[in-house]
Design a protein with these regions (language model features):
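Non-catalytic C-terminal accessory modules of carbohydrate-active enzymes
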Residues: 1-141
């Protein structure tokens, strides 16, 4: 994100797609993105900033804190949501619109155990267990 998107005339790579590219960038820079619209979930990633606030129309505020975030500390070690340990890999629309506080503990190496349980996974259009098996058709030869 810090190499392909810059504040220059050629700062967006590729086609802007009617604002979709910049919307992706803003969400991703905040540390979450609505991968499956309509699911009510925002998949978590690593925020670009150490601190950000989103003031919502309903008067609530979404606060994102990642005080140790840096070029070397780019991995999510742990996450607290509203002051409690949080092991899911997504937040919900309802959480955000209620004025959530996301506090990221960032580190220099990936945490390979956080968010690995099945219940931690976000909604998917095609989980491997849900994908029907397709039988190969016999060749006409």
């Amino acid at each position: 994100m810090d190499k392909l998107y810059t504040p220059n005339p050629d700062g967006y790579c590729g086609d802007e797609d009617n604002g979709q590219t910049s919307a992706w960038y803003v969400f991703s820079a905040l540390g979450f993105y609505p991968v499956a619209p309509g699911s009510g979930q925002f998949v978590l990633g690593a925020p670009l900033f150490r601190s950000a606030k989103i003031h919502l129309e309903n008067g609530k505020t979404v606060t994102i804190e990642a005080p140790d975030n840096s070029d070397t500390n780019r991995y999510v070690e742990d996450l607290d949501v509203d002051g409690k340990p949080y092991n899911l890999n997504y937040v919900t629309y309802d959480q955000l619109t209620s004025g959530a506080t996301l506090k990221y503990d960032m580190g220099s190496t990936p945490n390979l155990t956080r968010g690995t349980a099945d219940e931690s996974k976000p909604y998917s259009f095609s989980r491997s267990a849900d994908v029907p098996k397709v039988k190969a058709k016999k060749s006409r030869k």
